[in-house]
Amino acid sequence: MEPISPKHITVTDPFWAPRIRTVADIVLPYQWQVLHDQVPGAPKSSCIANFQKAAHAIAAAKAGGSRPTYPTDKWYYDDKNSQEKAFMGWVFQDSDLYKWLEAAAYAIPYGNRAYLTEKSREAVEIIAAAQEADGYLDTLYSINGLQNRFTNLKDYHELYCFGHLAQAACARWTMQGERDLLDIACRAADCICRTFGKGKRPGYPGHPLAELALVQLYEVTGKADYLQTADFFIRTRGTRPLFFDRERGVDTDGSDYIYNQAHCPLTAQTTAVGHAVRGVYLYAGAAAVAEHTGNRALQAACETLWQDLYRTKLYVTGALGQTAVGEAFGPAYYLPNDLAYGESCASAGLVFFAQRLYRCHPHAAYGAVAELALWNTVAGAMSADGCHFYYANPLEAEGVLNDTVPERKHQALRRQNWFDCACCPPNVARVTAGIGQYGFYADDSTLAIELPLGAQVDTPFGQLQIISALPESGDFTVKITRLKRPFILRLRLPDWCKCPTLDGQPVTAKDGYYVQQITAPTTLRFCFAPTVRLLYSDARVGANAGRVALSRGGLIYALETQGAPSIHALTLDSKSPIVYRDGCLLAAGTCLQGGDHLYTTAPPKAVPCTLRFIPFCRRLNGKEDQMAVWVRTTD
């Protein structure tokens, strides 16, 4: 099944529509200023400045001048290690502008149209001026030394940046019908396809994304070269002799490349290892290639990796990446809450991976995991004001420790106004603005609803309107009007709802779906009652021993201290009723009182108290400086 184009979807959901409008009205104008280094107190971006420097170098060369040469041997460049006219920032700095453009393409229909349209055109002009004559586009090498391009695929990010360029171009073409950025992306893709492939130059991205993006370009343009090059990158990755060995002039056993998921062929990988974002981007690209090439072995490998993530490494919030060391996956069932990394980009990548596997094999589990990641980690990575963001998303935080303990330095207690490594803020913006494309799918005979998302959708079968009251209440109405032809409706029933009803009667699920033949305009009134649930971990997750997490509907909740001396002093009475009130869960519990001694033979005094849980996506927005998803219980 293929996703319905976001061009035909208007999100009206009470949870997501305000967030999309915030992206259009606040987030994107704010990020535009950041990219121009115009926000006082925010880390310097240098993104736009780099494009302008590259354009100047290209123009000077065309006029017969010489191009200056600067070092291209670093991950990060600043005024301490580089000259003023050289490239500044991270090697992937270009991608921030591309993600901004993609988010703008999706956000324009929801507000601030004139501003976003004008700035998008300005951005495209900036990018066009920085493209080399042969289509190559990466400001680091255009500024610092074009002769060194494609010489360090392992560490530097030319192909990764291209991936975001191509995705932005596809979004702009799809949503606005503008070819300008698509033409730029196709010229860049043609340069890559001429360079890499069978009988050409070997190699593959150190940071995956080009694979998925090339498939997306193929889906938009129909140009087979793009699919073939994506397939080449996937098939040759990790094969012997190892390309990264050849590139570096060494001979290793491949363990150095676990971080890049390039230690062995993807079809031989059975566990998710290495950098979490790179991993899910690679898996999404591989699943996309498998879909279009019919490579069953590759599809099976992707499913194996999915099962490893889903069963042993996925946080209850939909976060991925257990350790800050390498921003990486950890061992099975190692899911620390306080040291969790859970990069926002990893949850976004998990959604991409879920979508691509769903397209290969429509299974309810993919939509369920996408919902978990979107409603909890992705939604919580951006503040209500649209100007502050989380990079890491631990499931437990203590203000003093987060500020002073080295192992927690990666965990900002509060959302930040920007980062010098700013991959997450524009990523969250583009996923939020484009969320509709992950919710609705169709083939010749079937319309599938995979996310509980309020929206108006123009489908091949007629007009679909979904009126949702989630997550506040369970009312979920599906209206089909202007029917063009009969079809089969497949509605994924939320796995958190034990007793879904249709017109007051219990719904019978078939593999997680409500299925009905639609032959006439109709209205289906479902109720997915968002009851409170206690969640327990597999016993092998040591960090959660003796603890429970609370959820209501699709939202995971976090306990805040409300003045208690420590989050660890609070215990939930799991036998008492839990009340939902004003968006929070209230429960009976106890607070242990500290004494004068670090250790004592007397048990601490337990004082009854009321515990307050808020949605994880709204955590630490006020004065609170401690929170925990998994809490001790009296059981």
Segments (PLM) and residue ranges:
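A conserved hydrophobic secondary-structure block that centers on an alpha-helix together
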Residues: 144-220
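Well-ordered alpha-helical scaffold segments within catalytic/enzyme domains
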Residues: 16, 101-114, 163-178, 211-222, ...
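Catalytic-core region of carbohydrate-active enzymes that cleave or remodel glycosidic bonds
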Residues: 291-312, 335-387
